[in-house]
Swiss-Prot record:
GO cellular component, as recorded: apoplast
Protein name as catalogued: CLAVATA3/ESR (CLE)-related protein 2
Keyword set, alphabetical order: Developmental protein, Differentiation, Glycoprotein, Hydroxylation, Secreted, Signal
Glycosylation, residue list: 70
First and last residue of the signal peptide: 1-22
Gene Ontology molecular functions: receptor serine/threonine kinase binding
Domain of life: Eukaryota
Similarity comment: family membership: Belongs to the CLV3/ESR signal peptide family.
In-chain residues carrying the UniProt-annotated modification Hydroxyproline: 67, 70
Region spans: Disordered: 40-75
Gene label: CLE2
Keyword Signal part of the UniProt annotation: yes
Annotated organism of origin: Arabidopsis thaliana
Secreted is among the record's keywords: yes
High-level lineage: Eukaryota, Viridiplantae, Streptophyta, Embryophyta, Tracheophyta
GO biological process: cell fate commitment; cell-cell signaling
């Protein structure tokens, strides 16, 4: 009987803690403003072909090599 009572109390505790820890939904207007505010910074940090040419790659193979494996030309 004590084991059943303990199990019931534990399940009740888990249920109440999950309800108390529930998050509230986000407001749509605030999310849109944040996304619009981040768009220019994303565009400014994205790499371009001009950046690769300025770095000196000019169509050469990359300096960094793959770790190898059974077939290094697989990808």
């Amino acid at each position: 009987m004590a084991k059943l009572s303990f199990t019931f109390c534990f399940l009740l505790f888990l249920l109440l803690s999950s309800i108390a820890a529930g998050s509230r939904p986000l407001e749509g207007a605030r999310v849109g403003v944040k996304v619009r505010g981040l768009s220019p910074s994303i565009e400014a940090t994205s790499p371009t072909v001009e950046d690769d040419q300025a770095a000196g790659s000019h169509g050469k193979s990359p300096e960094r090599l793959s770790p190898g494996g059974p077939d290094p030309q697989h990808h």
